[in-house]
């Protein structure tokens, strides 16, 4: 990571360092010119991740598609927004971890099984990652149409704990032309997992 994005990441780490009574020195750098032809990147933390994600979903239109790959999905406003997007005609595909295992421990499917049932009843396409003791640990949402794409990905699960300032999280938001490699790569990753193209 370079340029203004690197400075933004450093600033978030300085806040954490200060909170922990540590010190992360500031690096003096010159001004960076952003190349507006390239996708633009924004660093998001905690509640800003929630706000940007909700805006991404709520601003989606009939010609958009949203692909969501998530380890934990339970934040109520996001679930409601996904259902509303589907009702507006947005093509929506949700890929979830079955929450049967987490870091070597057996689990009971909470929260994803309940949310998947709710989404499925509303007509949203939902699939499970084929996990065999490991986790489908992706945390990515991608909105795209022929011209423009927007993606948010990083450390945050879509739960109240992760999105309402109860846990330290860092994501990035990437916005740009849909033909950019970053969006093609993200779409390819999602398609591979969605259709099990690597037979895993």
Which positions does each model-derived feature cover?
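Residue-level signal for well-ordered alpha-helical segments
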Residues: 30, 34, 59, 149-151
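Short, small/polar-rich loop/turn modules that mediate ligand/substrate recognition or access, typified
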Residues: 1-55, 96-117, 191-200
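Conserved helix-loop functional segments at active or binding sites
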Residues: 55-62
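PLD/PLD-like phosphodiesterase catalytic module centered on the HKD motif
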Residues: 2-6, 62-65, 75-200
């Amino acid at each position: 990571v370079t340029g203004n994005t690197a400075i933004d990441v450093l600033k978030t780490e300085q806040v954490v360092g200060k909170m922990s009574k540590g010190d992360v020195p500031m690096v003096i750098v010159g001004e960076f010119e952003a190349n507006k032809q390239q996708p633009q990147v924004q660093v998001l933390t905690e509640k800003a991740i929630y706000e940007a994600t909700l805006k991404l979903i709520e601003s989606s239109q009939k010609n958009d598609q949203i692909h969501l790959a998530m380890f934990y999905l339970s934040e109520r406003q996001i679930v409601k927004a996904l259902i509303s997007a589907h009702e507006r005609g947005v093509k929506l595909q949700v890929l979830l971890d079955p929450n049967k295992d987490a870091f070597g421990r057996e689990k009971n499917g909470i929260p994803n099984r309940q949310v998947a049932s709710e989404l499925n009843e509303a007509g949203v396409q939902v699939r499970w990652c084929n996990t065999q003791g490991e986790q489908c640990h992706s945390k990515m949402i991608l909105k795209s149409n022929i011209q423009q794409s927007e993606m948010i990905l990083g450390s945050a699960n879509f739960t109240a704990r992760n999105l309402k300032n109860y846990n330290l999280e860092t994501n990035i938001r990437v916005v740009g032309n849909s033909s950019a490699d970053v969006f093609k790569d993200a779409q390819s990753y999602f398609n591979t997992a969605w259709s099990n193209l690597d037979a895993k």
